[in-house]
Design a protein with these regions (language model features):
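Conserved functional micro-motifs across diverse proteins
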Residues: 1-169
Length: 169
């Protein structure tokens, strides 16, 4: 925990994308693409320390411990997706694949409407959690995401984000 707090304070001036880059798989910008960040306990702690530093506050250990306890048995991702219409986030489906098994999320947050990015691309920021049960800490997993190209849903975009859990602290 101390190492993560130091990392967050030392890198407080970096953007979220910069500080989380080593935990992120990025498929690029544009419709049907996106990025996924694995929120490990180390990264979660570092981000809380970064936030406290930016606000000129002390890092409160009880806040960090509560946050870590909350997600202790979870694999957590923050996902950024690019779509073609304002409500595309409503069609997003998540799966975590490991060892020929598919796991459904136990928690998903996706806003009902997207934000507009440059060149009118629609952007959705979401958070998804999966139970760690039956997934070892050194597993190679795939975060599989599918969403509609257009409101009718005839065509779908599919994004696959590969994570080797053993490589993330």
């Amino acid at each position: 925990i101390e190492e993560a707090i130091e990392f967050g304070i030392k890198n407080a001036e970096l953007s979220l994308a910069e500080i989380a880059s080593n935990w992120t798989v990025n498929l690029g910008y544009g419709e049907g693409k996106g990025s996924a960040t694995l929120i490990t306990p180390f990264l979660r702690t570092a981000l809380l320390a970064k936030q406290a530093q930016q606000m000129g506050q002390q890092v409160r250990r009880e806040v960090i411990e509560k946050a870590l306890t909350e997600d202790a048995d979870m694999i957590v991702f923050e996902v950024l997706l690019f779509g073609g219409y304002p409500q595309f986030g409503r069609s997003v489906k998540f799966l975590l694949k490991y060892d020929k098994k598919e796991f459904m999320p136990v928690y998903t947050f996706i806003p009902s409407y997207s934000e507009m990015g440059r060149d009118y691309t629609q952007i959705v920021k979401s958070r998804v959690k999966f139970k760690k049960t039956d997934i070892p800490s050194d597993a190679k997993v795939v975060l599989w995401i599918q969403f509609n190209v257009e409101p009718e849903g005839k065509e779908k975009y599919t994004c696959e984000f590969d994570f080797d859990l053993s490589k993330y602290r």
